[in-house]
Amino acid sequence: MEHLERCEWLLRGTLVRAAVRRYLPWALVASMLAGSLLKELSPLPESYLSNKRNVLNVYFVKVAWAWTFCLLLPFIALTNYHLTGKAGLVLRRLSTLLVGTAIWYICTSIFSNIEHYTGSCYQSPALEGVRKEHQSKQQCHQEGGFWHGFDISGHSFLLTFCALMIVEEMSVLHEVKTDRSHCLHTAITTLVVALGILTFIWVLMFLCTAVYFHNLSQKVFGTLFGLLSWYGTYGFWYPKAFSPGLPPQSCSLNLKQDSYKK
C-alpha cells in the first residue's frame, strides 16, 4: 500500500496540475506534427510498437473507450460523492460518460462512412486493379481485396479525447483529501494510479500512431476531432447550467471558465 500511495502522490503532482490541462492539448498537436514529419522524412526502423499486434494496441488501444469508461465510472462516483454527498449531483456528473460514449460512437461512425464513400477495392496493396464489383470494405476484404479510402485516424481521435478527459476529471483531486483511515482511501488511491497509468499509455500510443501509422492529413483530422470533442464539452458546454457539469472545485465557475481562455 505504501508503494501505491507514493505512486498516487507522484501522479497528483503531475497530471492534476492546471498547467498539464492547459498545455497537454498543445503538446499532443506538436507531437503529432513532429511525429508525422519524422515519418515522412526519416522513417524509424520497425519495432515492437510499430506492429499492430503489440500488447498495448490489441488489449488497450483497440478498446480505449471501454478502459476509460470503466475506470472513470467509479472514480467520478467516489470522488464526487465524497465531496458533495449528493447522489443527484453524482448521477449528473456520471452523465459525462454517456456524452463521451455518444461522441465516440458518432465520430467513429463518421470516420467509417468517410472511408467507405471515398474508397475503392483494389487487387493489391499497391492499389493496382480496381475491383468495381465490391461496394463495401467488408465485402472487399472477404474476397481478398484491399480497400483504400480516406481513413481518418481513429487512434488519434480517441487517444486525444480519452487522455484529455481523464486529466480533466482528475482535477477534482485538488479537493479530495483522505487519510488511511478513510473508507474510500484505498479505492480512490488505486483508481488514481490506474487512471494515471492509462493516461501515459494513451499518450505513448498517440506518439506511436504519429510516428508509424497513417498520413499527415488523416492524423490531423483525427486529432482535430479529439480536440473539438474535448473543448466542446469541458471548455464550452459543461461550464453551463444545463449540462453534466465540471468536476467539483472550491473555486468559482468563472475561474474555471477563464482557464480555458488563457
From Swiss-Prot:
Any ranges marked Cytoplasmic in the topology annotation, and which?
1-23, 79-93, 167-190, 240-262
* Any one GO cellular component localisation term in the record: endoplasmic reticulum membrane
Reactions accelerated catalytically: an acyl-CoA + H2O = an acyl-4'-phosphopantetheine + adenosine 3',5'-bisphosphate + 2 H(+); (9Z)-octadecenoyl-CoA + H2O = S-(9Z-octadecenoyl)-4'-phosphopantetheine + adenosine 3',5'-bisphosphate + 2 H(+); (5Z,8Z,11Z,14Z)-eicosatetraenoyl-CoA + H2O = S-(5Z,8Z,11Z,14Z-eicosatetraenoyl)-4'-phosphopantetheine + adenosine 3',5'-bisphosphate + 2 H(+); hexadecanoyl-CoA + H2O = S-hexadecanoyl-4'-phosphopantetheine + adenosine 3',5'-bisphosphate + 2 H(+)
Looking up InterPro entries in the UniProt record yields: FIT, FITM1/2
Localization per record: Endoplasmic reticulum membrane
Q: Which residues lie on this side of the membrane: Lumenal?
A: 45-57, 115-145, 212-218
Q: Does the keyword Transmembrane helix apply?
A: yes
Membrane-spanning segments: 24-44, 58-78, 94-114, 146-166, 191-211, 219-239
Q: What's the superkingdom here?
A: Eukaryota
Q: Pfam families attached here?
A: FIT
Q: What does this protein do?
A: Fatty acyl-coenzyme A (CoA) diphosphatase that hydrolyzes fatty acyl-CoA to yield acyl-4'-phosphopantetheine and adenosine 3',5'-bisphosphate. Preferentially hydrolyzes unsaturated long-chain acyl-CoA substrates such as oleoyl-CoA/(9Z)-octadecenoyl-CoA and arachidonoyl-CoA/(5Z,8Z,11Z,14Z)-eicosatetraenoyl-CoA in the endoplasmic reticulum (ER) lumen. This catalytic activity is required for maintaining ER structure and for lipid droplets (LDs) biogenesis, which are lipid storage organelles involved in maintaining lipid and energy homeostasis.
Please name the disease the record associates with this protein: Siddiqi syndrome: An autosomal recessive disorder characterized by early-onset progressive sensorineural hearing impairment, global developmental delay, regression of motor skills, dystonia, and low body mass index. Some patients have an ichthosis-like appearance of the skin and signs of sensory neuropathy.
Report the sequence similarity comment from the record: Belongs to the FIT family. FIT2 subfamily.
List the protein's name: Acyl-coenzyme A diphosphatase FITM2
Q: Which organism is it from?
A: Homo sapiens (Human)
